[in-house]
A protein has these predicted regions:
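C-terminal motif of bacterial Sec signal peptides marking the signal peptidase cleavage site
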Residues: 5-9
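A non-catalytic alpha/beta surface segment that caps or lines the substrate-entry region
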Residues: 12-23, 32-83
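Second-shell loop/turn segments in exported
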Residues: 19-24, 38-48, 65-66, 99-109, ...
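Sec-exported extracytoplasmic/periplasmic mature domains
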Residues: 35-43, 58, 62-66, 117-128, ...
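Active-site-adjacent substrate-binding region
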Residues: 42, 173, 180-279
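Solvent-exposed loop/turn segments at secondary-structure junctions
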Residues: 43-45, 70-71, 83-84, 93-97, ...
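Structural recognition of the beta-strand scaffold that forms the well-ordered cores
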Residues: 77, 86-90, 134-137, 172-178, ...
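Acidic/histidine-rich catalytic neighborhood of metal-dependent amide-processing enzymes
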Residues: 103-204, 221
Length: 279
């Protein structure tokens, strides 16, 4: 879940497009990891299911490791080391605790799979001498039971708040992947996202043939895992299609996803990171 701040809602229109013209990001492998996550069932922060998933994911990231989050939670992090400041590619890997049975195909699993596959892609594609690139899967993005919407930023976003507090001085930018694989994916700029970094993302998307997935315009501002970074003065963007009609429902399942949509996001983000990380 991310919290929309617009009184009129955050919906939009759908459309259909293909994947990217580049062939660096493997959406088939990413969808296999989505299926693995969904097979675990609901995966709220602190649950045995999320613990098992974290143990699986840490082995998939370069220099994979856990970083502690208050409350007994843990972020999963990896690094392709280089000179700073670091580029961070992030997503949350927990799911909502309610409703019972929620599996978060787009809200959690898709972004997680995209980050893991981007790590594989960039490990192959980045040139020698590249900037430090980090991959972080945030725990505790979803609000714990009893957290009112008015306090979402204070009691949710636990992993991203912890990571930003621990590493802010080392970071150059954050690229956050949230709802990034739904059918009809459209990603206008989210209202809190850094406009200059977003403009570079749109240029990268055009270069790999997926400009239609990133239309001009702006979504309302959303409280999501990028906000702790913005508050720390770090440019950050949030890739989230808040028109996704199955958000926060039991219908957020694998059949609502589109491999071409995730491929478009993966190719665009890979292009952006390669451009920014190349000396």
């Amino acid at each position: 879940m991310a919290l929309c701040l617009a009184a009129s809602g955050c919906g939009g229109e759908e459309g259909e497009d293909g994947g990217g013209e580049a062939d660096r990001f493997d959406s088939t492998a990413a969808f296999e990891l989505i299926d693995e996550q969904l097979a675990l069932g609901q995966r709220p922060a602190g649950s045995p299911q999320l613990r098992r998933l974290g143990d699986r994911l840490v082995a998939e990231l370069p220099q994979g490791r856990f970083e502690p989050v208050p409350g007994g939670l843990r972020n999963v992090a990896g690094t392709l080391p280089g000179p700073g400041p670091a580029i961070v590619i992030g997503a949350h890997y927990d799911t909502e605790a309610q409703p019972p049975g929620f599996v978060g195909a787009n809200d959690g699993a898709a972004g997680t799979a995209a980050v893991v596959e981007l790590a594989r892609t960039l490990e192959r594609e980045l040139p020698d001498g590249h900037r430090d690139v980090r991959f972080v899967l945030f725990d505790g993005e979803e609000e714990p039971p009893g957290c009112p919407d008015a306090r979402f930023e204070q009691c949710a976003l636990r992993g991203s708040r912890a990571y930003a507090a621990a590493h802010a001085g080392e970071l150059g930018e954050l690229i956050l992947l949230d709802y990034v694989a739904n059918r009809g994916l459209r990603l206008p700029r989210e209202g809190n996202s850094d406009p200059d970094l977003w403009a570079e993302l749109r240029e990268a998307a055009a270069a790999v043939g997926v400009a239609d997935r990133f239309p001009e315009g702006r979504q309302p501002p959303i409280i999501d895992d990028h906000v702790p970074f913005l508050r720390a003065g770090i440019p950050a963007i949030d890739l989230i299609d808040f028109s996704y009609e199955h958000a926060d429902t039991l219908e957020d399942t694998a059949d609502k996803l589109d491999p071409d949509a995730l491929d478009a996001v993966g190719e665009a983000v890979a292009e952006l990171v390669i451009r920014r990380a190349t000396p």
